[in-house]
Design a protein with these regions (language model features):
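C-terminal flanking tails of non-heme Fe-dependent oxygenases
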Residues: 1-97, 102-103, 125, 143-144, ...
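Residues that line or immediately flank small-molecule/substrate-binding pockets and catalytic motifs
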Residues: 18, 109-110
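A short, charged helix-loop
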Residues: 110-141
Length: 338
């Protein structure tokens, strides 16, 4: 593995078992993560400890849900989720850079009861999930999977903290004692159509908003990572997850750790499933740099980013940042989260 981003040709694979079980050479694992974050912001993880049977149940129940007719899926439409921003959306309802993505999906988050203080206050992105009434296996798998991912997210953020020369508890002490955890299940139809003079992407070029994304993908492939030399494929690796850092970690590290653009297209003759889990700062956490910003890095960030917007100019809480993004992804839900 190399630190120089221009020489990145593939996404590295890192065994994180030392972080998960909190034994062995954690510093070595943290160093590998640090090199990957500086080079491309993307890396596979193995040795993560997430039960393979749970992953199979999640995939099987998800396929059952998406195989239903549209009317049945719309019974848990996002419009019914209100300020919690949960539920199903059909193909074309989600936008990236103002263009409709060729995918459908379900949005989930931490399951919170109506009497939870943040739900009672009406804080957006907090509340109960919407689950299909006739697929209890999906509910069980989603909630168990989110618990496992949250635990894994804490372990990985400890490794990222150590990779930066910080105490392992740095992020938990300041940002993720109560992380904003968001989970998506996406289904990409197998018949992508051309739009105008180019392809219609499952997800167009974008970066993620928060700290860390942990992605489970099926064996169809299609994820691509942007590099100075072009787009690098990130094909499926058995029993691995793809991790990438988000805009807030890019901001915190003054661009040393890169929130790298990526995109998705369907490369096979069948539908593709993906399962991104977002481990993000607390909604009310004010995002501040860990180190002094390097003006050169900040300038090159603006020039290179897909949206020509520097994350290093952002001031405010993570809630401020993600709500501004929500209004662009789902314009029709803007009123419910404002």
């Amino acid at each position: 593995m190399t630190d120089h981003p221009s020489s990145v040709r593939h996404v590295p694979v890192i065994d994180v078992s030392a972080l998960v079980v909190r034994e062995g050479d954690r510093s070595r694992t943290a160093d590998e993560i640090g090199r990957a974050c500086r080079a491309s912001g993307f890396f596979y993880i193995v040795g993560h400890g997430v039960d393979e049977g749970l992953q199979r149940r999640l995939e099987e129940s998800s396929r059952q849900f998406f195989a239903q007719d549209l009317a049945r899926k719309m019974e848990i439409a996002m419009e019914r989720g209100g300020r919690a921003w949960r539920g199903y959306f059909p193909v074309g309802a989600e936008l990236t850079s103002g263009k409709a993505d060729l995918k459908e999906g379900i949005y989930f988050g931490q399951e919170l009861a109506p009497d939870h203080p943040r739900v009672k206050k009406g804080i957006p992105l907090h509340g109960a999930n919407l689950f299909p009434r006739d697929l209890p296996a999906l509910r069980d798998a989603v909630l168990a999977y989110m618990d496992a991912m949250t635990e894994l997210g804490h372990a990985l953020m400890e490794g990222i903290a150590v990779s930066l020369g910080l105490d392992a508890s740095y992020f938990a002490d300041r940002y993720t004692r109560e992380p904003l955890t968001l989970f998506r299940i996406f289904s990409y139809p197998h018949e992508p159509a051309a739009v105008g003079d180019g392809p219609r992407w499952g997800v167009g070029e974008h970066t993620d908003y928060g700290l860390l994304t942990i992605l489970k993908q099926d064996d169809a492939g299609g994820l691509e990572v942007k590099s100075p030399d072009g787009w690098i494929p990130a094909p499926p690796v058995p029993n691995s997850f793809v991790c990438n850092i988000g805009d807030m970690l890019d901001r915190m590290t003054a661009g040393q750790y890169r929130s790298t653009a990526h995109r998705v297209r369907n490369l096979t003759s069948r539908d593709r499933l993906s399962f991104p889990f977002f481990f993000d700062p607390d909604f009310d956490a004010a995002i501040r740099p860990i180190v002094e910003a390097d003006a050169t890095l900040v300038a090159s960030d603006r020039d290179a980013r897909w949206d020509r917007a520097s994350v290093h100019e952002f001031e405010g809480t993570y809630g401020d940042y993600i709500l501004a993004k929500v209004s662009k992804v789902f314009p029709q839900l803007r009123r419910s989260t404002s």
